[in-house]
Swiss-Prot record:
Protein source organism: Pithecopus hypochondrialis (Orange-legged leaf frog)
Highest taxon above the source species: Eukaryota
Family: Belongs to the frog skin active peptide (FSAP) family.
Name of the protein in its database record: Dermaseptin-PH
Principal subcellular localization: secreted
Native organism taxonomy: Eukaryota, Metazoa, Chordata, Craniata, Vertebrata
Length: 70
């Protein structure tokens, strides 16, 4: 009977440890995904600003060429 109790305790303990490790990995993966999302949003905002400025510069150059030709 004593061996059975020890075996059950060992199985329970290993199950809890396994579950704990899985939860920790899941939490780490979620944190990584959140960081990736934040970085993606920052990159998107940066590209939006760069393209906006490039568009303004191109439009100004076209206006200068049109006005210079008249």
């Amino acid at each position: 009977m004593d061996i059975l109790k020890k075996s059950l305790f060992l199985i329970l303990f290993l199950g809890v440890v396994s579950l704990s490790i899985c939860e920790e990995e899941k939490r780490e993966n979620e944190e990584e995904m959140e960081q990736d999302d934040e970085q993606s949003e920052m990159k998107r905002a940066l590209w939006k600003e760069v393209l906006k400025n490039a568009g303004k510069a191109a439009l100004n150059e076209i206006n200068n060429l049109v006005q210079g030709g008249q």
